[in-house]
Curated annotation (Swiss-Prot):
Belongs to the class-I aminoacyl-tRNA synthetase family. One of its GO terms (molecular function) is zinc ion binding. The gene is cysS. Zn(2+) binds at residues 27, 208, 233, 237. Signal peptide: none annotated. This is Cysteine--tRNA ligase. A motif ('HIGH' region) lies at residues 29-39. One of its GO terms (biological process) is cysteinyl-tRNA aminoacylation. It catalyses: tRNA(Cys) + L-cysteine + ATP = L-cysteinyl-tRNA(Cys) + AMP + diphosphate.
Length: 458
């Protein structure tokens, strides 16, 4: 098996530190808001990685953290007039609901930053002892970036090129703008813990270093996360962990490509962030999972209605091939499974793996056409087994195809309403009335108001 290592910028033959066992840490969420589809892509990608490694016989220890204390949590809690702990707990429950809705496997361990404050303090003390950290004039403790000679080795940028990242605060207390905070001195009304440097709370980056190494040891096999975390977060994790423990931190780094919305960057400033909950109102979970895994995990992917519809049609092909076949136990594999493994062993090449699954669909249909139902059923069982690695083909064909028809009907209704609104805007009343009649024939009642057009199926 070969996996692309962001650290070396090349595919490497994957050999776990301990034979047959894989220790994997993935950065989780800061719990102050709903999970969006960008988070969803990263979660589903690493869910696929865990499922595949386990299918290949590895004993995987999968750790994904929760950041439950952070500036953003404190700010949002203040706006909501609730405690940071209450806000975090509420969104942790929401996160778990979304995780279940996405069919993402729960991690083996899900550490929270607030549970690891003693380990965080211990690591900061080591950094101070090793002279990689200092206390600023304001009482915060900072990491001395220029003291760590390998800084920039993950993002492949020289220190002179680097600018303070979006989540690295500029402060007069720093010796250098690139230095980042390890421990923040307590402010009135904020959560705080005792430390050798006074009351305060951990910085964001140090949390992941302490949690991952405390649970998995150092070094461990794979550290994953979204590409947006590569710098400064993951770069800072390496610096802290290797300066503190004086040994390598992680063997292999994996980064999931970013998700775009209609080929535009997803951002709050553009107002185009889509939550998982919104996405699952529009599309079935299998359609969403298929779409999010359809491109190579390292490449950017554009979320659009057209791409989701393509995903729905692709899944229809799978389920139409399975419909009406007897269910048999999957006991033996064919060359298709070998070729599937070959694709996935090449840096989790899901586009080639999906192409192979469609080959299987064509073969199933040929068997069916030739009335070789037993052969079709055996291959269908193999197809379902491979689909499970992607969290797909979990419905009965009847369930999915009926749901897909309803979804298609809703999309058609929305399309007709948009066309009618355009006609009304142009004062083309004849066309608007014709479309209203079409909708009535579909059993749809519409109501126009100053807020727009609402509809319901009767």
């Amino acid at each position: 098996m070969k996996i692309f290592n962001s650290l070396t910028k090349q595919k490497e033959i994957f050999k776990p530190i301990e034979s047959g066992k894989v220790k994997l840490y993935v950065c989780g969420m800061t719990v102050y808001d709903y999970m969006h589809i960008g988070h969803g892509r990263s979660w589903i990608i690493f869910d696929m990685v865990v499922r595949y490694l386990r299918m290949r016989g590895y004993e995987v220890t999968f750790v994904r953290n929760i950041t439950d204390i952070d500036d953003k949590i404190i700010k949002r809690a203040g706006e909501n007039k609730e405690s940071p702990a209450a806000l975090a707990e509420r969104f942790i429950q929401i996160l778990h609901e979304d995780e279940k809705a996405l069919r993402v496997l729960s991690p083996d361990q899900e550490p929270r930053a607030t549970q690891y404050v003693p380990e965080i303090i211990k690591l900061i003390q080591k950094l101070l002892d090793n002279q990689y950290a200092y206390t600023g004039q304001n009482g915060d403790v900072f990491f001395d970036v220029r003291r760590f000679k390998d800084y920039g080795k993950l993002s492949h940028r020289h220190l002179d090129e680097l600018q303070a990242g979006a989540r690295v605060e500029v402060s007069d207390s720093k010796r250098d703008p690139l230095d980042f905070v390890l421990w923040k001195k307590a402010k009135p009304g904020e959560p705080k813990w005792d430390s050798p440097w006074g009351e305060g709370r951990p910085g964001w980056h140090i949390e992941c270093s302490a949690m991952s190494s405390s649970i998995l040891g150092q070094p461990f096999d794979i550290h994953g996360g979204g590409l947006d975390l590569k710098f400064p977060h993951h770069e800072n994790e390496i610096a802290q962990s290797e300066a503190g423990e004086e040994k390598p931190f992680v063997k292999l780094w994996m980064h999931a490509g970013l998700l775009e919305i209609n080929k535009e960057k997803m951002s709050k400033s553009l107002g185009n962030i889509i939550s998982i909950r919104e996405a699952l109102k529009e599309s079935d979970v299998e359609v969403l999972r298929y779409f999010l895994l359809s491109g190579h995990y390292r490449n950017p992917l554009s979320y659009s209605k057209e791409n989701l519809e393509n995903g729905r049609l692709a899944l229809e092909r799978f389920y139409l091939a399975l419909r009406g076949l007897p269910v048999v136990n999957h006991e033996k594999t064919s060359s298709y499974t070998d070729r599937f493994y070959e694709a996935m062993d090449d840096d989790f090449n899901t586009p080639i793996a999906f192409a192979l699954l469609f080959e299987m669909v064509r073969e199933i249909n040929r068997f069916r056409d030739n009335n070789q139902i037993e052969k079709a059923a055996v291959l269908a069982a193999e197809l379902k087994c491979l689909g499970n690695i992607f969290g797909l083909l979990q419905y009965s064909p009847e369930q999915f195809l009926q749901g897909a028809k309803k979804e298609a009907d809703v999309q058609e209704i929305k399309k007709l309403i948009d066309q009618r609104n355009e006609a009304r805007a142009k004062k083309d009343w004849k066309t608007a009335d014709q479309i209203r009649d079409q909708l009535t024939d579909l059993g749809v009642a519409i109501e126009d108001s100053s807020d727009g057009t609402s509809w319901r199926q009767e």
